[in-house]
Amino acid sequence: MNKMALASFMKGRTVIGTPDEETMDIELPKKYHEMVGVIFSDTFSYRLKFNWGYRIPVIKEHSEYTEHCWAMHGEIFCYLAKYWLKGFVAFQAAINAAIIEVTTNHSVMEELTSVIGINMKIPPFISKGEIMNEWFHFTCLVSFSSFIYFASLNVARERGKFKKLMTVMGLRESAFWLSWGLTYICFIFIMSIFMALVITSIPIVFHTGFMVIFTLYSLYGLSLIALAFLMSVLIRKPMLAGLAGFLFTVFWGCLGFTVLYRQLPLSLGWVLSLLSPFAFTAGMAQITHLDNYLSGVIFPDPSGDSYKMIATFFILAFDTLFYLIFTLYFERVLPDKDGHGDSPLFFLKSSFWSKHQNTHHEIFENEINPEHSSDDSFEPVSPEFHGKEAIRIRNVIKEYNGKTGKVEALQGIFFDIYEGQITAILGHNGAGKSTLLNILSGLSVSTEGSATIYNTQLSEITDMEEIRKNIGFCPQFNFQFDFLTVRENLRVFAKIKGIQPKEVEQEVKRIIMELDMQSIQDIIAKKLSGGQKRKLTLGIAILGDPQVLLLDEPTAGLDPFSRHRVWSLLKEHKVDRLILFSTQFMDEADILADRKVFLSNGKLKCAGSSLFLKRKWGIGYHLSLHRNEMCDTEKITSLIKQHIPDAKLTTESEEKLVYSLPLEKTNKFPDLYSDLDKCSDQGIRNYAVSVTSLNEVFLNLEGKSAIDEPDFDIGKQEKIHVTRNTGDESEMEQVLCSLPETRKAVSSAALWRRQIYAVATLRFLKLRRERRALLCLLLVLGIAFIPIILEKIMYKVTRETHCWEFSPSMYFLSLEQIPKTPLTSLLIVNNTGSNIEDLVHSLKCQDIVLEIDDFRNRNGSDDPSYNGAIIVSGDQKDYRFSVACNTKKLNCFPVLMGIVSNALMGIFNFTELIQMESTSFSRDDIVLDLGFIDGSIFLLLITNCVSPFIGMSSISDYKKNVQSQLWISGLWPSAYWCGQALVDIPLYFLILFSIHLIYYFIFLGFQLSWELMFVLVVCIIGCAVSLIFLTYVLSFIFRKWRKNNGFWSFGFFIILICVSTIMVSTQYEKLNLILCMIFIPSFTLLGYVMLLIQLDFMRNLDSLDNRINEVNKTILLTTLIPYLQSVIFLFVIRCLEMKYGNEIMNKDPVFRISPRSRETHPNPEEPEEEDEDVQAERVQAANALTAPNLEEEPVITASCLHKEYYETKKSCFSTRKKKIAIRNVSFCVKKGEVLGLLGHNGAGKSTSIKMITGCTKPTAGVVVLQGSRASVRQQHDNSLKFLGYCPQENSLWPKLTMKEHLELYAAVKGLGKEDAALSISRLVEALKLQEQLKAPVKTLSEGIKRKLCFVLSILGNPSVVLLDEPFTGMDPEGQQQMWQILQATVKNKERGTLLTTHYMSEAEAVCDRMAMMVSGTLRCIGSIQHLKNKFGRDYLLEIKMKEPTQVEALHTEILKLFPQAAWQERYSSLMAYKLPVEDVHPLSRAFFKLEAMKQTFNLEEYSLSQATLEQVFLELCKEQELGNVDDKIDTTVEWKLLPQEDP
């Protein structure tokens, strides 16, 4: 080393010896910024060690795609020149000279240090810079990445939601994929044109034409479409499919960057090219490479490199085809939701390739279930239907995989369905009705058994495609495209069903007319009401007039008027067709269906006509006698049994006696009624008779006792209380009366703590079960680690210590080696003018193939076909050398210097060869010096932006109306927000703390004092609180927006990037830093980190103590900033809740928000021509508000309620029309009373209830609850704390269990643990919900969900209960249970209930009074009996014929018997007449006439009863349909509240 130190360039340099390499690696780099290490293995072998990037190039050997030279300011720079310019070669020459001198005692220092380095001729190129080149490739790659995300997301969503059903309706598999493909191909071509224009217009690609870029992008886009299809098939979850497609594209596309640095093996390149992002990146690399050398990609160019681009085009086209084939393959092979999928080798079956006509399944007469043929539970089919079996079901079994094992939904079903009949499938919730319909429609596949439709097997795919042409299917759920209008939906599905284009418009008009949808035909489906969506779904099913109609609860959610219209439509279409439907409404099945099939727990119980079922399982007729105190039960019973010995007394109460009479004894009725007419002196006030209903049949089949159906009075009418089964009711009443009283159970502070704990538990459960949210959060944090991982990889690839041996074999051929690329011979140019044999001989001793030429022939630098050349000058005793290198050979200069050094030593007859290697120092602190910290800063930026993924759950609560439901149930806003914060803040703190721990101690490597560590933790806690509260503020302000965590996180990120850039530009000026930390909460923690780095930097530089103390003070000051922000944000939340939040029931003890008093506005309209009962109710409501002392204050008082909405603008230039939803409605609900609100869809029932709850603010009028003289918002401490509210929509959390819902609401309402457990257990037992108690809500049936909502509304014994269509979607058994509970709750005379419903049976069963609404106005109100007396003075005669051919003769006979009879409607064999009261009395004579007519015309059955409220309701609904158009309430528009009413 002393010899080396004599070199001229070593002046001023220090040479330090170390005992070993470890000392050199660890100690010296800390003291010396720039240092060169020399490690000798022996005398002739050594290794040079440099700091990375100081003396050697920053990359390894280049591949052909990387730029080796660049131009700057008119000069050309090449990477390999760094060896020469930065002194690497000088060190090498000095050390080699020293070794030679020590070995040979000859000094060659002058010869070696005077070697001149020359670059060979550089071919023309375009200089763009490597970073720009890589950024260009990355931009090209990600230009379509967002596309594949949205394509995968949309296709997966559409496939999961619509494809199966559209396939059932006749959509072909190819049509589905082609429609999406063509849609996205248009997008791809537009984007490809745009990208090609951009790339060829800006100085990036100069010599490659537009068509090449366009073709590459187009083929890549097509492959991405196919890849999106494949992802949507492989991954069912739309969100995951989109993310998987995006990550697939980015990852494999980034992997394509390896072609910029490595020459991959050909086979590996072809394999990786099966991944289209890799092939695209490689193609772009090829284009830029050829463009760099001024050739570009030009077609046709057979002699050039264009064939490589052609190969890329072919591989991208092949990738597209490859992905499409796998898409179609996995579409058939992967099991669907039911676990059904084709065999993996389905394509080897002959049936797949040849669409031969399958032999139809022949049905023989004896091919019936032997059980059914001998079972009297099944009515034999009349001979006229023999041979008309349209559907044959044989031993159909359907199994599902449940959590506890296999669940049998259907268990060996056998029966036939006949053409020309309407067949109804009946059964309890979960009986298997929908499963059977899904199997018949092809939506599902049976596990075992077979089914045929018109002798065509459903199990054969080819047959199924034929069957679907003739099937119309209405699923249980509404099915339509939300963004299309009603007309457009019908038009689309008409085309899917294959209706001829010429007939589409005519067919659409027919459906609109038949279902009375003219008023909604141009309205977007998303804005339709539930009943209107149901109409549209049914309309889609009957498009094309299919021969087979399969309808799953087609009239669910329809009002009676619409329901009767559907019945008429189906009756008209049943001739020569098959109609099979399911329903929960027994009356609908009784009237509409010719044959009923009962299922129970997946088994077939019975089948037959109504008369057969009623005779088999019915009780018979119900004779109800209303009595007074003079009535002697024994005498009356004896009288009845004289006429009908089989009569049984079923119910006895103080006011009523109910007897069951056998069906076959109707001939005895006239005499019985004649005697009853004479019993007025025995205490009989009036009597009524009703026939057995299918409800009773259903309950008897299920082994349940039934509540007596509402009776139809046929005698002198007085107020009637419907009598229920006294045993069941008394038991239910005992259960409910024993529930704990909760309204005064706890103090405000204790209740607040209990509510906080309940909300925190809720948030924890939601967080634990919302895997999607956690997955997104983990994904974002994972993305934050990507830059660090990439830096690690790049550090490994380009910066990590690598030992490179500079041997001639790197570039030059050996003597016995066959010529191969990229090795060449070494060119020796003799410029000495004499013989240089000694030098040549010494060079050959190094096993190098030489090519010797004279300088006069070539100078050695003009021919870049050689990897390197040595130009020899001087004379034999004093050689001088110049070395010329090919600019693409990065390590050429060190190799040639080694060759020259060994040649000189060989001249002195020494055979040893000097071997030199190069490596670099690997130091931890080099990371800071070289910017490795940038990746970790990115990690901190992302971490500070993830609070929206944690703190925005309130948006989903708001959109599901759960939040308002909690407020109505008594939850305080402060308890809600603080309860959420108890979970969100610790979670976010753990994330922040963990990431900062990693950042400080792993990436930065500096140690914090315990004091600073404590301050850091305090600051992190404050920032976690501040950012979570900020997120709460944003979620409140933008709660009506879509919950978009990613959008807000990205917004935070952009803000942080901008602020960080400003901080860097201002050199972290203290004032700017503090201001940004104060006003930008997401930057607070990052600014704190910057201060800590600054402090650590000052300590390392031994800065003055006063400067360090100043920074310490700043750090302590900034620690208080997030806590100040937290207080401000919490106050903002309080202000928002006070101004714009949901109405609260009582004063919030923390936010100090009092219930707001409503501003009552005078009603803009005066009532005109009101019914006298409605007018009396208005006066009573007004008196309840103004009278100082009332004997009995109503529980609910609604006075002059008026509600107006504004329609949404249809265009920018249109004006908003005002719609009136509620018009001058007044009513009172008394203590111990159930008031029913009935009305057509859109009549204003739900709006009325929402105004009472405070969810909707009335435009005018006032609501008073619990007798308060002010509004409900001004309650005192001794008044109600919460309402019992069951909304029309199920406001539930899908992933929480039923038990968790009940426990949450019990805590919110103030129940203690023991009381809550007692209440829950008793209510669950009363409604038979034990099996569903631990099941997630999303797995429950609609009926069970309604039960849960109902239980939540009555939990805690509220004094005011509001029920908005609570019994929708429930089977008769469930309805009976809820009716019993509701009746038992009102036994408490302090409690009042308001109920809305569409169904008269519900209202008559549970309501004390009813009010009917039409177009937002109250048309009538009163007790059930009062309304019957007032509007139902006529009688209804229904006759069911056995032979429809007798219609005319029968009609003539009826007019003879009842001259004023009016023919109402006719459903096939059912005839209905309205009879005036004078034609009917006396009833005994009327029944005598009917009995005689029954015998004469062989009638199946008849019933005579007073006109029901159903008919009254239908008449009023017709008024709404035909009313004033301007006044009609259109619920199909998305109304916007008046400006002053909602923020």
UniProtKB/Swiss-Prot annotation:
The keyword Transferase does not apply. GO terms for biological process: lipid transport. ATP 1 binds at residues 427-434. PROSITE patterns: ABC_TRANSPORTER_1, ABC_TRANSPORTER_2. Widely expressed. Highly expressed in skeletal muscle, heart, brain and gastrointestinal tract. GO terms for molecular function: ABC-type transporter activity; ATP binding; ATP hydrolysis activity; ATPase-coupled transmembrane transporter activity; lipid transporter activity. It is found in: Membrane. Induction: Down-regulated by cholesterol loading of macrophages. Probable transporter which may play a role in macrophage lipid transport and homeostasis. This is ATP-binding cassette sub-family A member 10.
